[in-house]
Amino acid sequence: PYLSDYMGKVFEEICKQYLWKQLLSGECPVEFSSLGRWWGNDPKEKRQAEIDILAEQDKNTALFGECKWTNEKADLGVLETLVKRSELFSYKNVHYYLFAKTGFTKGCIELSKKMVNVTLGDYKDMMERM
């Protein structure tokens, strides 16, 4: 379990580097100037919340990302939670990135296609593009 915890943090850093590379190559849908992690209070849930990646272009536009380093495929709940947490902010234009070690469930893929403003990236595809 300790290796997975360690690799989770390493994977987050890989995802951030991937987004910077996407930005520099003009392939990122959000032209952000800052990128980092966010921790804060969720008044609806009355508890702490975290977002692995928050990248801001301006006061209206941002990218929200979640990074999952697990042996299970990232499911619909991961995307739904990210969307819910993004609603703590007042950005009008949002794009979501989900990164996963082993890919995504069918439900997650289908919802991402319906939403249009979601990019899914698994580790293998990311490494091929870097």
Residue ranges and their predicted role:
Residues 1-130:
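A cross-kingdom feature that marks ATP-driven nucleic-acid transaction machinery
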